């Protein structure tokens, strides 16, 4: 229907994955993820799906599914010559699995996620840059730490920098990180 290939949709027992999003008076959000069917994804299943994207140049993976399934997808994407981007939302309770960042061309984390992953509070541009360097030190080729209204800090093999955010008055920041990742992937 409408040219959408649904042949890879797998029906499993249980409910669909759900995210409950609470938005405060300032427009900031807090998200609780209930994996549901997302938790059934396996490395073999995700790796097998990469062939469906022949001709694609970028694989973008969030962590709303089991991290080992993300690793399987990244391995296959890399083998297919794709550039890989990982959005660290939400950070798994046990942190990132071994090898995930080694398969990542660009890792994207917000201040909270970057702090959880690097063990240091990210409160300003300097601490965001420290976190970006730490993420690169763990294997990612490049790292971006988003800072909400203060834009983003980035670190690549060619250098580091800051990109300002477009000034807006937010009503609701739900999906801001997802939108950032999508726009980055689209180039």
Each PLM stretch: what is its role?
Residues 1-58:
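Conserved N-terminal subdomain of the carbohydrate kinase-like
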Residues 2-3, 39-44, 86-92, 163-164:
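Short gly/ser/thr-rich secondary-structure transition/capping motifs
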Residues 7-16, 87-89, 134, 144-147, ...:
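Beta-strand->loop->alpha-helix junctions that form or flank phosphate-binding loops
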Residues 34, 121, 164-165:
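Short clusters of small/polar residues that mark proteolytic maturation junctions
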Residues 36-38, 89-91, 112-114, 166-169:
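Short, acidic/turn-prone active-site loops that include or flank metal/cofactor-
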Residues 56-130, 150-152:
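Conserved beta-alpha-beta core of the PfkB/ribokinase-like small-molecule kinase fold
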Residues 93-94, 98, 102, 125-187:
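Conserved phosphate-binding/catalytic region of the ribokinase-like
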């Amino acid at each position: 229907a409408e040219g959408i290939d649904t042949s890879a949709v797998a029906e499993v027992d249980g409910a669909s994955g759900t995210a409950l999003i609470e938005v405060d008076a300032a427009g900031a959000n807090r998200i609780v993820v209930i994996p549901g069917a997302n938790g059934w994804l396996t490395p073999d299943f995700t790796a097998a799906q990469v062939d469906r994207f022949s001709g694609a140049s970028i694989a973008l993976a969030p962590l709303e599914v089991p991290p080992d399934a993300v690793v399987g997808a990244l391995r296959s994407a890399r083998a297919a010559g794709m550039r890989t981007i990982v959005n660290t939302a939400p950070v798994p309770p046990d942190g990132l699995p071994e090898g995930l960042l080694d398969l990542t061309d660009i890792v994207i984390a917000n201040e909270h996620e970057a702090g959880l992953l690097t063990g240091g509070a990210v409160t300003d541009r300097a601490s965001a840059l420290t976190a970006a360097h730490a993420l690169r030190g763990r294997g990612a080729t490049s790292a971006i730490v988003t800072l909400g209204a203060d834009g983003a800090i980035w670190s690549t093999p060619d250098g580091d920098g800051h990109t300002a955010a477009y000034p807006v008055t937010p009503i609701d920041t739900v999906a801001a990180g997802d939108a950032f990742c999508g726009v980055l992937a689209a180039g």
